[in-house]
């Protein structure tokens, strides 16, 4: 029996990788919301002084990455690998953010699951001894996502009632051996669940079945109940996806 597997879809990390530090950077709109106090930095300008939305998103990643390193009292060279992703073609914002780090880089494309995916992979590398310290980094930007998935803002198209608002923000966690925690003890990897959603704007409804299936499988694999957790968080399912 493989002691690193748990149930049907889960894995465990017996060496308990820890989150040494984390940082979150948000856009102006997000800075006015209920999570304002939890952001390390709030941008006053949605373009962050850059020439394009995509460059602005890359700057969000750079800022979150540098803040996380600073909070962990580490230099970039103290890391062994960088896992980063975004919502854009060729992970362009992540690639440009990683360009100046001189770190081994694995680009991820998991949509709203990218932060969880990057943490899963970082914890896997640290737990197995392939890395002593790894960074898990992701970002999104409302304007760059609109251009990628819906309509460029300059087009002036009307948003559908089912279209959620993609967050302008970036988050980074430094995952390492030892430490005081919080620790990553395991992970559950989800499956594709296609319920035939035809509305291309309603991404929340398209993702909701996979989210609930993964959460259900996590409880089953680890023999736990929802009450055992202080908080259960998903990617952005939007209002309709959350209701589902």
Which residues fall in each region the model found?
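Condensing-enzyme catalytic core mediating Claisen C-C bond formation in acyl metabolism
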Residues: 1-54, 152-216, 221-224
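Conserved beta-ketoacyl condensing-enzyme motif
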Residues: 19, 53-110, 228-243
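Short beta-strand segments
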Residues: 20, 83-85, 134-140, 175
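Short glycine-enriched loops at secondary-structure junctions
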Residues: 24-25, 84-90, 140-141, 180
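Short acidic, glycine/serine/threonine-rich loops at helix termini
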Residues: 30-32, 93-95, 145-150, 243-244
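A glycine- and small-aliphatic-rich helix-loop capping segment at beta-alpha/alpha-beta transitions
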Residues: 35-38, 94-104, 126-128, 149-158
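Short, well-ordered amphipathic alpha-helical segments that serve as non-catalytic structural scaffolds
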Residues: 55-73, 119-121, 206-221
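Active-site-proximal alpha-helical scaffold in enzymes
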Residues: 108-136, 175, 209
